[in-house]
Amino acid sequence: MRPFRLGLTGSIGMGKSTTAALFAEEGVPVWDADAAVHRLYAPGGALVGPVAALCPAALKGGAVDRGALRDWIAADPTALPRLEALVHPAVAADRAAFLAHARTDIVLLDIPLLYEKGSEAEMDAVLLVTAPPVLQRARVLGRGTMTEAQFEAILARQMPDREKRARATHILETLGLEAARAYVRALIAHIRETADA
């Protein structure tokens, strides 16, 4: 029997990583699209050579430098679609390998661009994590890893939160850790009860 596939999505700064960690604490295997990209870009990763062929400046120390890729994407309007043509099939293959080895009743698939890339059809349900815009902005800019302009550029590429809310099966407002933990536990129990019915 294949596991129940719960997709986890939400815009940047909404609490996806924290929510995924809560599922992992409950014993639910988590596949993370961003982590898959990091593995593929790391030394020896399957995308190092192909990405370096597209953007030689992105090759640093045998790995793909994401900062150099961001600069390339900002400077060349044709860069992102060419990069995605390499990345998305490789990430899909990584996800398929994870699913092929999953021996559990539920898996969580953490996919930031789940709706934008049409992955929702592969899910049994989708959990959207969300937060008020002021909290989202504070979380992202408080990390100190990007500028406000970079944050706005990422938001512009992501589907608006209100559209995601309309499409999601489940919605979690990530306002506090204990409330989120309780929600995750209740959702896991609900999925298991529904599967047993």
Curated annotation (Swiss-Prot):
Keywords: ATP-binding, Coenzyme A biosynthesis, Cytoplasm, Kinase, Nucleotide-binding, Transferase. It is found in: Cytoplasm. Pathway: Cofactor biosynthesis; coenzyme A biosynthesis; CoA from (R)-pantothenate: step 5/5. PROSITE patterns: DPCK (PS51219). It comes from the Bacteria. GO terms for biological process: coenzyme A biosynthetic process. Its EC number is 2.7.1.24. InterPro entries: Depp_CoAkinase, P-loop_NTPase. It catalyses: 3'-dephospho-CoA + ATP = ADP + CoA + H(+). Residues 5-197 form the DPCK domain. ATP binds at G13, M14, G15, K16, S17, T18. Belongs to the CoaE family. Catalyzes the phosphorylation of the 3'-hydroxyl group of dephosphocoenzyme A to form coenzyme A. This is Dephospho-CoA kinase. It comes from Cereibacter sphaeroides (strain ATCC 17023 / DSM 158 / JCM 6121 / CCUG 31486 / LMG 2827 / NBRC 12203 / NCIMB 8253 / ATH 2.4.1.) (Rhodobacter sphaeroides). The lineage of its organism: Bacteria, Pseudomonadati, Pseudomonadota, Alphaproteobacteria, Rhodobacterales.
